[in-house]
């Protein structure tokens, strides 16, 4: 992600001695993203990813790292956290919590086709099933409570039309969260940020999901909605690509069949996914933090997506024949 906390090779060389990874040979900052500080590091034993957590606390982090370990042990393709000689997954670096995980093979597929969307859908369903019995419960930290806190903060920066959009959508989502349909939705640990740049492919072969540091317990359908809103759209307009949507949803449904309640909530959850990222991008755009290599995202992208999900009918979650 962006480099908020610089780390030199000398810093790394001293810190890494607590791991069984050999000597540090190289370190390179990763510029994409705006939440944590990430580096590619090379040691005598191979390549890894070092993350320094800028917002999450030492107390919150066991959820994320142990979830990744839990998933990996059950055949879900995710990075493996690396423990120190003492068995610790989380260790202080420059006074902040930090962790090392294995580096996945391949690269992100930024122009996905239906075959890639199907692979992501199937793996996402397997991830939800595998995580269902994960013993640690931690809420989605960008869930409805966070949205209710953040909306008033960004509201003064908005145009009149966007103020109206945000106020109306917040009211809509808060009302839905009180409904019987919402309370029937299946839930558990979710990734919550499964964008194209958080999945690796080697050709058409999916090699793993990564960056689980927005994960939390929420509805599985929200996770599907966030994923569809990124993988299955025309990036210029935000319009859903029907072929890619169908490929992702059908592949997911084949592994973990959707429910009638999820079908009823589908369009609402697509709106919720768009709202969550519109709010976070508005916050980061108007209230940025200092960082090297910072690359803020355009809030207008998810404003467009939210308006589309409100105005246009969406493909069904599943068909009666599915």
UniProtKB/Swiss-Prot annotation:
Top-rank lineage group of the source organism: Bacteria
Example GO molecular function: homoserine kinase activity
Keyword GTP-binding appears in the UniProt entry: no
Class in the EC hierarchy, top level: transferase
Transmembrane region(s): none
EC number(s) per entry: 2.7.1.39
Pathway: Amino-acid biosynthesis; L-threonine biosynthesis; L-threonine from L-aspartate: step 4/5
Catalytic activity: L-homoserine + ATP = O-phospho-L-homoserine + ADP + H(+)
InterPro entries hit by this protein: Aminoglycoside_PTrfase, Homoserine_kinase_II, Kinase-like_dom_sf, Pseudomonas-type_ThrB
Alphabetically ordered keywords of this record: Amino-acid biosynthesis, ATP-binding, Kinase, Nucleotide-binding, Threonine biosynthesis, Transferase
An annotated GO BP: threonine biosynthetic process
Record's keyword annotation contains Amino-acid biosynthesis: yes
Protein family according to the UniProt entry: Belongs to the pseudomonas-type ThrB family.
Designated name of the protein: Homoserine kinase
Upper lineage: Bacteria, Pseudomonadati, Pseudomonadota, Betaproteobacteria, Burkholderiales
Gene name as annotated: thrB
């Amino acid at each position: 992600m962006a480099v908020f906390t610089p780390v030199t090779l000398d810093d790394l060389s001293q810190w890494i001695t607590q791991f069984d990874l050999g000597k540090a040979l190289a370190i390179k900052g990763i510029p994409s993203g705006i939440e944590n500080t990430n580096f590619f590091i090379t040691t005598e034993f191979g390549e890894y990813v070092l993350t320094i957590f800028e917002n999450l606390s030492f107390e919150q982090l066991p959820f994320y790292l142990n979830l990744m370990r839990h998933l990996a042990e059950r055949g879900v393709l995710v990075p493996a956290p690396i423990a120190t000689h003492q068995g610790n997954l989380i260790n202080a670096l420059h006074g902040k919590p930090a962790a090392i995980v294995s580096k996945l093979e391949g690269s992100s597929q930024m122009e996905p086709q239906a075959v890639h969307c199907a692979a992501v859908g199937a793996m996402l369903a397997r991830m939800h099933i595998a995580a269902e019995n994960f013993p640690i419960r931690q809420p989605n930290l960008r869930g409805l409570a966070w949205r209710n806190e953040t909306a008033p903060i960004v509201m003064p920066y908005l145009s009149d039309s966007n103020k109206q959009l945000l106020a109306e959508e917040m009211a809509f989502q808060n009302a839905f969260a009180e409904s019987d349909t919402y309370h029937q939705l299946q839930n558990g640990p979710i990734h919550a940020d499964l964008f194209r740049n958080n999945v690796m492919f080697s050709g058409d072969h999916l090699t793993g999901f990564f960056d689980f540091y927005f994960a939390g317990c929420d509805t599985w359908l929200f996770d599907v909605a966030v994923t569809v809103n990124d993988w299955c759209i025309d990036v210029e307009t935000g319009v859903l690509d029907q072929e890619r949507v169908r490929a992702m949803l059908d592949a997911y449904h084949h592994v973990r069949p959707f429910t009638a309640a999820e079908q009823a909530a589908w369009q609402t959850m697509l709106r919720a996914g768009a709202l969550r990222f519109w709010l976070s991008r508005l916050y980061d755009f108007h209230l940025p933090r200092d960082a090297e290599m910072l690359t803020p995202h355009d809030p207008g992208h998810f404003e467009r997506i939210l308006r589309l999900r409100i105005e246009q009918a969406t493909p069904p979650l599943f068909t009666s024949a599915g």
